A protein has these predicted regions:
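Conserved catalytic core of the tyrosine transesterase superfamily
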Residues: 1-192
Length: 192
């Protein structure tokens, strides 16, 4: 979606290249996985699976302590790969967390959700997004679900990726575009 692209571009164009990379990578990862913010920030290296030297999937402990495996989209793969490459170049301490501070007295500790929330609002404002003050990391989860549906994925697939117990919950997340609704209506065969 164009709003997500603008958000990611604004995140990357930070006065501090290090901070820009971090903000871009984390927001792209959240959008590219559909994870809840708590799920993403609690991920450790032990939760990560590689394929051909590239991050491939993450093991997530979701609501109700239900475990699921989320295969990374190309967007999430690129974002995580770039972030981990940066952390290794910076000589990051052996923090088990994928998304942790790389400097200062918080070095090695995972980012708090409120820090990510504040960063997202700053970036959204810089991107010129309307309603930037109401944007939350959870909205990226909604965008992920809607984008998958727009791409023709079934609601059962989206339900599993989001870790929902019920399709009714997934339906709340899915915002079908007018174009898709028109295509659906035209798909009905004519009878006369």
């Amino acid at each position: 979606p164009p709003e997500v692209a603008r958000l990611l571009e604004a995140a990357y164009k930070n006065r501090s290249p290090r901070q820009g990379l971090r903000d871009w990578a984390l927001l792209a990862f959240l959008y590219g996985t559909g994870l809840r913010i708590s799920e993403a920030l609690s991920l450790t290296y032990a939760d990560l699976t590689y394929q051909d030297g590239v991050p491939h999937a993450v093991r997530v402990l979701g609501k109700g302590n239900k475990e699921r495996v989320v295969v990374l989209s190309p967007t999430a793969q690129r974002a995580l790969f770039q972030w981990l490459k940066h952390r290794n170049l910076e000589g990051h301490p052996t923090s088990p967390y994928l998304w942790s501070h790389t400097a200062g007295r918080e070095r090695g500790k995972p980012f708090p959700a409120r820090t990510v929330q504040a960063m997202l609002k700053r970036v959204a404002r810089r991107a010129g997004l309307k309603d930037w003050a109401r944007l939350t990391p959870h909205k990226l989860r909604h965008s992920y679900a809607s984008a998958l549906m727009e791409a023709g994925r079934g609601i059962d697939e989206v339900k599993e990726l989001l870790g929902h117990a019920s399709i009714a919950t997934t339906q709340i997340y899915v915002h079908v575009s007018r174009k898709r609704l028109e295509e659906a209506a035209r798909a009905l065969p004519e009878v006369f």
